Amino acid sequence: MEKRELLYEGKAKKVYKTDEENLYIIEYKDDATAFNGLKKGTIAEKGIVNNKVSAILFALLDKNNVPTHYVKRLSDREMLVKKVEIFPLEVIVRNYAAGSICKRLGLEEGLKFKTPVLEFSYKNDELKDPMINEYHIQALELATKEEIEIMTGMTFKVNEILSEYFLSKDIILVDFKLEFGKSSEGILLADEISPDTCRFWDKNTMEKLDKDRFRKDLGKVEEAYLEILKRLGGM
């Protein structure tokens, strides 16, 4: 497997082409951003933690018949993935009230929802990733009705699998965002699943173990990321 030219660099990852047309290499960075890029910084070893956590969780989902872009972890910071055409959407699941939904709906942080809440965001940095619904998605031709249904079904399945898995590690999966892509195999779960893209709370202390520690200047950011990896058996 030969790593070739840089295809794309985002806030948290670099994507490289390889000598195989349908395979890419993702390299995870230590750069951290919040509030749509308004806050920037670095979290030591974040790239290593996010790569290892994502690899563990993608492998778990693959075993549970959720198709993902993950092939294998190559090194501390790199993983091999299948080439996909990413939908310009973020699919968000909220099991508890936290973050923007508290401000938007006047909810107290920590409220457990009777059923999981699913939201879509339009991936657009200039517009600050506005929330949209399935009608916007179809009208703007971002995805078809059938594709939306597939992504929705996969998202709820991911939530069931991961919520149970994290509870077994004494972690509450508060909320998370997913991204999906199209490939010759159909729709695949893509991007990453990590403390960057999920809210994790300690089941017993309710301590935040995710990027909120960076967003809110709570301190011990690196320790929180490493704690997640440790509980998942990745250290």
From Swiss-Prot:
The record's EC number reads 6.3.2.6
Keyword GTP-binding on entry = no
UniProt record, GO biological process: 'de novo' IMP biosynthetic process; cobalamin biosynthetic process
As its record notes, the protein acts as a catalyst of: 5-amino-1-(5-phospho-D-ribosyl)imidazole-4-carboxylate + L-aspartate + ATP = (2S)-2-[5-amino-1-(5-phospho-beta-D-ribosyl)imidazole-4-carboxamido]succinate + ADP + phosphate + 2 H(+)
Know the name of this protein? Answer: Phosphoribosylaminoimidazole-succinocarboxamide synthase
Which UniProt keyword terms apply here?
A: ATP-binding, Ligase, Nucleotide-binding, Purine biosynthesis
Its family remark reads:
Belongs to the SAICAR synthetase family.
Q: In which pathway does it act?
A: Purine metabolism; IMP biosynthesis via de novo pathway; 5-amino-1-(5-phospho-D-ribosyl)imidazole-4-carboxamide from 5-amino-1-(5-phospho-D-ribosyl)imidazole-4-carboxylate: step 1/2
Nucleotide-binding as UniProt keyword: yes
Record the organism: Thermoanaerobacter pseudethanolicus (strain ATCC 33223 / 39E)
What are the GO MF terms of this UniProt record?
Answer: ATP binding; phosphoribosylaminoimidazolesuccinocarboxamide synthase activity
